[in-house]
Amino acid sequence: MALDIEYSTFFKSDLPAPSQRWSGFPEYNFIGGHNDAETIPVDDMIKSISEVLKREGKTLATYGLQHGPQGYKPLREFISKKVNKRSGLSVSSDDILITSGSGQALDLINAAFCNPGDTVIVEQFSYGSAINRLRRIGVKPIGVPLNDEGIRLDLLVERLEDLLDKSIKPKFIYVIPTVQNPAGSIMPEKNRFKLLEVSKKFQIPIVEDECYADLIWDSSRPPA
């Protein structure tokens, strides 16, 4: 027996308008970052997955809570070694938190830093989901223009000075310095040091998104 209830009367008053019914990908698809399906080594993946299941199957079939809320420790140890080797940082497995994708990571960061009405600095063109997540919790993203080397640091300083003159201090600066989304630019190392100087001068932390940082084919990966 179905209940005759008008559920829309229980919805939040500030919900966004319903999206259009799904009709398939557009002709030029920029939805999601993924490899060309023809290049995926399916046979090698099957072999690797089979080996892991034989070795860790019982652990993988359960929640694995024995490793604590930060996630599966062997994976955290692997990630910490990779970060130390490739990004120039020095971290341990205890500094790593496993999340269900970048969306959950962004939500946790926003929950830790932001209140409704706060301001966050972002690149003028940036990861759409990051912007939407800020707006959804009542945070105002302030965009700074880009060039072929990433965020314009001169304009970033101008924007910060203008906001501070109005007694507005952004909670953090969200940037994608390596293979920027959607521009694809890579911030030079000298600019990275300048960005750190800006962060120190204005006492505003940086949230660095390195989703595509491994996709560099013709040069070494710059430091985080």
Please place each PLM-identified region on the residue numbering.
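A short helix->loop->beta-strand "cap" motif at the edges of active sites that frequently abuts
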Residues: 118, 139, 201-204
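N-terminal small-domain helix-loop-helix segment of the aminotransferase-like
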Residues: 8-100
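Active-site phosphate-binding strand-loop segment of PLP-dependent enzymes
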Residues: 151-221
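Hydrophobic residues in well-ordered beta-strands that form the structural core
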Residues: 122, 143, 206-208
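Conserved PLP-anchoring active-site segment centered on the Schiff-base-forming lysine
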Residues: 112-130, 134
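Conserved Walker B
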Residues: 96, 125, 210-212
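Conserved beta-loop-alpha segment that forms the PLP phosphate-binding cup at the N-terminus of a helix
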Residues: 73, 92-120
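A short helix-loop-beta submotif of the ANL/AMP-binding
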Residues: 134-141
